[in-house]
Amino acid sequence: MRLILLAGLMLSVLAAHAQGVSGTVVGRSNDGKEESIIGAVVLWEGTRSGTVTDASGHYRIGVPPGAKRLIFQSINFVSDTLEYSGQTTIDVTLREATIDMGAVNVEGERSATYINSRDPQQFQVLNEKELCKAACCNLSESFETNASVDAAYADAITGTRQIRMLGLEGKYTQILFDNIPAVRGLSSTYGLTYVPGPWVKNIYITKGVGSISSGYESMAGQINVALKNPDTAERFHLNAYAGSGGRTELNLVVGPKKAEEHEEHEGHEDHEEEEEHEHHEHHQHIKGSLLAHAAMSQLRTDMNEDGFLDNPLFSNLSLRNEWHFDGHSGLGAQVALNYQNINTVSGQLDYNPTDEIRSQLWGVNTRTRRYEASTKVGYVFPDKPWKSFGSQFNALYHDQEGDYGFQSYNGEQRSGRVNLLFASRILNESNTFTTGFSYVFDDYRDTLTSNFPLIVNNPPYALSRQERIPGVFFEYTLNARDKFTMVVGLREDFHNVYGALFTPRLHARYSINDHMTLKVVGGMGYRTAVLVMDNVGMLASNRFIVIDGDQAPSNKYYGLDIEKSRNAGLVFTWKGDIRYRPATLSIDGFITNFESQVVVDYETPGYVYFYNLQGRSFSNSAQAELQWSPIRRFDIRMAYRWLEARTEYREGLRDRPLVNRHRAFTNLAFETRKKANGSQWRFDATVQWISRKRIPFVISNHGEHDKEPLSSWSDDYWQVMAQVTYVFKTNLELYVGGENLTNFMVHDAIVMGNETSSSLFDGSLLWGPVFGRMGYVGLRWML
């Protein structure tokens, strides 16, 4: 019955920019009062496609092919330009212009990170200003100044960084690059390191389940990374970085020559567009961008004096080439190509895989090659901008080899994805929908060999597998002006092994008044486990790996269930003024319950078990965050987050390992007034407190059990990071910074580190930093 309902609603074909955008334009006066703006101009940058807000400040506009930036303008208010990456709702608050009559300069303010309170999804936006507050060498390091996402090392040896949202590992967060699912499969842990920070334009962080048009895999959250492209890339951007840990980087962004500034577009009335259309020939426009990244580190350091490298030695080359085609009559296309070549070495301090003697030491040597291509094609009806078709096509090949001490891993992934969408409205602009079809193909071929053998209770189970998943979906949006917005999504997928997967989701927003908003989020999510790469930190040990799936004959991969969860959240947002200065308070709570899960059990020393959940597994999260600008150019962001993440192990219901229950966070940012030549100083500091974490039962470095009968707890600790940037002029910046300024280190991060041939050798239970105080310097040059 569900299939009949969805198939009847689905109109098939095509998507990337396949839906309209609606929202409200609000003006905020200097005394803090807000009211909707009537007649505000809303238009797409570089086009003549625009509209104006109605008597309620509301607008709706179609999305032309290649559209990336939406401009908002109104008399007596500072214009604003927002990035578009597939949102259905974009709301904006324009500030009353502050005019210096002597210099005739108009100044506006824009936060480095902000919460969109008018979109029914609860998402936070991190822009380039926020990303520049830290070194942000790659995407996995871009969340150091964010309270909603935890970033930590997966183990004490490989240097792999992973994220957590709502107390759950990053594998439960769907990560998109330009609205295309990207970090999944064999890249589920390493994938965030594949994207250099200077390539990123914006990051959109969604707590809870995301839109069903992107698939069923978002369980704890969704992160959409908007990469620089031909529409948003600088004409030339060079970023050079060097750190005291031996890491050096060079990043290059090259974009097309920019068109005329959008301020020159005036009087974009519809009748003018029609008249000019009769006298101008249709034209086509092709533009491209190139993103390049090269990095390496060959400095051997051991600051915590445990005999192992603090950070891996590595070399990395990444390239991205993207082309946009903007045709006439509403047709457009985008093509992007990606390449990564990454090599890493870590382990004992003198380990060298190419040396006959030193290669006998315990070490890790990995080699990764990744090729990816994606295409988007869209069509918007010229006379019906609210009606559009679109398509996304994505293909990748991922090849990874690795020696991990006594174990060797080889993995290949061949994946393809098609997403076809149609968007339109029902009766009027308040009722819109998006429907479509998707097909996902994954072919995994991975093997793990070891002197400490892989143990599988039923030998026919193999690590290699193939997934074929067609699916259909329908998403309805009700937008009752500025008061209430609701998005209801239904999705049905058909997995070749796990059968039908039904995914309902709901996002609703209610505006209590001009300052307070309430949101409700709920839905389901699924994923199939990729045992080795989901848990690559376990290879930083000599643990025996035991896959203990169902004993009865089954087609399930490894005899393990598909992971299935239900997520619900409630979000309250207040936007107003404190002492006549803008402030935002956000309070949220989320509950995630697993109906089925692959439990990863480290509770027995020397072993790691994989088995189906037999009992409860859940995560409860609550967070409060305050953003305030007490004076112009000075921002304060404070947050507190509480977590309760527990799973039923064979030993009973216990806290999930290495998850801190409490985290307190403060970020301070100040910049001086710009001089006539554009020069200024910028200062940023972040302080955070991380509470203790549960460490699974281990053997001490002296070969004796810990004093506590089943587990131990880490210490809590503080971390401080800071950065100073000097802007010589508008296109040249020098920055100097430091991380872990408290110099806190874990000195016993590796269990039995002096007995690397023991089955009890274990570097997989890292709970804090192993590298002490670190300084860095960098340069940004933009044209």
Where are these regions (language model features)?
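Short, acidic, small-residue-rich periplasmic hinge/interaction motif at the N-terminus
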Residues: N30-G32, I38-E45, Q73-F77, Q87-C132, ...
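Short acidic/polar hinge/loop motifs at secondary-structure boundaries
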Residues: Y59-G62, I180-G208, L319
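Extracytoplasmic beta-strand/coil segments of soluble accessory domains associated
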Residues: S140-R184, K201
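Membrane-embedded beta-barrel scaffold of Gram-negative outer-membrane proteins
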Residues: Q284, G390-N394, H398-E401, S511, ...
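Flexible loop and strand-edge segments within Gram-negative outer membrane beta-barrel domains
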Residues: S297-S318, H324-F389, A395-S415
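Gram-negative outer-membrane beta-barrel transporters
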Residues: L585-N593, N612-V698
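C-terminal beta-signal and adjacent terminal beta-strands/loops
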Residues: W689-G703, T725-L783
